[in-house]
Amino acid sequence: MAFRHSKIVCTIGPASCSPRMIRRLLEAGMDVARLNFSHGTHTDHAQNIATLRAAAVEQEKPIAILADLQGPKIRTGPLAGSRSVLLRAGQRFVITTAKVLGDSTRVSTVFRPLPREVHRGDRILLSDGLIELRVLKVRGPEVICEVINGGALGEHKGINLPGIKLKVPALTSKDREDLVFALKHGADYIAASFVRRPEDVLLAKTLVQRAGKNTPIIAKLEKPEAIENLDAILGAADGVMVARGDLGVEMNPERVPVVQKTIITRARHFRRPVITATQMLESMTENPRPTRAEASDVANAIFDGSDAVMLSAETASGKYPVEAVSMMARIIEEAEASDWESPRRVPLEKLKVAETVAELVCHASRELHMRLIAVFTHSGFTARMVSCYRPAVPIIAFSPESATRRRMALIWGVMPRHIPNVQKIDGLAAIAEKRLLEERLVRKGDVIGIVAGTPMGIRGTTNFMKFHVIGGPA
């Protein structure tokens, strides 16, 4: 059975939002669709959600929708004529909180505290770090700078202040509006941007609970402060994203690979799914094939233990969105087929019953050469627990809950499947065998593992394990 354990997250944008393109992305291997709330209107996102849901039903493939909030991103303002301007090394350049149309000498920002937050000698980076400024002085609403590294500056580009701990809210008013919208439209995950401390995650969770939902929160790690508070954030979040774009601007590029491995290792320790993101196949925005370095980057993220890898501009605005997904799927499959062994999760000091059952069934799957592991779950807890121990065989997650099946689309090694509510533990083997034979996922004589919890339907009660031979007594 051809199977890919690691999942693919695709950002939906102008290049990929049509029904035809959504269908092609699903066929190529998309598991999770990311909606970037830094761009587009609520009308755009509502249309994309409807298109995604319709395509998922048509192809009978559960797909998770990840709503990615903009966060307290500081950006430059508009430019005269909406045209890029060229900044040259050595010239003076002003960033002002006044409302002005920018040009080659100045640009506005809506971040009003900026003049209070920076001082002489501080570095300011624009446009994902491509342009570097040094603060000369602050005069009223103006921050007067010298251009150290020049370049072309477009409208609404990011402003980064390395080494400066900004006093900004974890969620802006726009984020709160977008969060309510995303929850109303059934987003399966919420990504909180620029998380710096666990309180940022807890705030997002509080707002989710107030809306009467239990939607998981993914913490995007893109600030050095987040790395300082990594374990506390992992304890609060439901998953994390290694957002290497802003992370690579806020810290020296040579540190990013080490930090990436640290985040993934700690996330595995805390049993949190981790998405590795940003510029993975960046050249495929313009070219039909990636560079060899990009292919290695994707493979190494898999070797590190990522649950999922993400495409951003490659699928949102690139020329080859379908080819990028197909290429990423092939790289993952090749990496997973190699002799390189995925790192096992670092065990906690004391295993609980659920963890012990999950670890044992994964160990048995190797010893008994199982075809797959069948998991019966309402909330997805059992499937996530088994996934933590990285079995070599697929995890078929049977659930009567549509929201659970969609969320499982992000989790490593899990193939979500619908099944009616099962009340009795005795019939699990017969139910699993019938369904698996119908889908031709097993053959007579195959050994499978069955994991569930009793009483059935109660979260966190993973305490049942059975080995079953297809065609044998149930």
Task: Give the predicted meaning of each segment.
Residues 1-474:
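Non-catalytic helical/linker scaffolds that mediate oligomerization, partner binding
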